[in-house]
Amino acid sequence: WIEKETGIPVLGILPWLKEIFPPEDSLDLLERKQVNQIAEIEIAIIKLPRISNFSDLDPFFSESSIQIKWIEPDQDLGKPDVLIIPGSKQTIKDLEILNKTGMSTQIKAYAKNGGNIFGICGGLQMLGKSLKDPHEKESSNELGSYLYMGLNLLPIKTTFGEIKRTKQKEEIASWPEVANVKGFEMHYGESDLINKTNSDIISLFKNSSIGWVHQKKDKSFIGGTYLHGIFEND
């Protein structure tokens, strides 16, 4: 029927097999509800309006020791063990939503009180001090500027270029332990440490600057990476 109606040659149809094929970003996000009575760790994930690369979070749903809690930007954050800020199709606009709803204030308070935070791609960019978008790749000048303030929880600055970086990566992780990891990059922004001599900030990978973490004295951490698929390495 498909070939007849569309004129496109069809060899066959593959059924969707749960836990084998990755789900669609937005549709699956609305359907997933996890109730884990024996969970030891609660991970809260900010449900950004323009969330992307939802498959980054798939590994957590198969862990019996983890309870996932989705947090809308206008909801109470609570006190999760870890907070994840995922990727976004439009980082700056989603950052504006966090500011308008007061979620950014909650995140900063959570960090100040010893909360653990990890950002993926756009989430990493939001954690930084500033985001500059001169080519309007992630924003538009209707917001009034090409320079936007981040959450200022990591001492990094991000500039969005004209070319989107898409690359498969194999890296050697240096935190929390040395390990070989695989994943991919897919982003416009390039981030740099504001002070490269800051000994409190650890590069997540030995050979490239695509992720950093601040391991604080109270053992809590704030970090992030551009590497999608990082949690599939275990």
Task: Give residue ranges: language-model regions.
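Internal gly/pro-rich beta-alpha loop/helix module
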Residues: W1-E40
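Beta-strand->loop->alpha-helix junctions that form or flank phosphate-binding loops
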Residues: P9-K18, K69-D74, K157
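Phosphate-binding active sites in nucleotide-utilizing proteins
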Residues: E42-I45, P49-G122, M126
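C-terminal and late-domain segments of enzyme folds
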Residues: D58, Q67-K69, P73, K167-D234
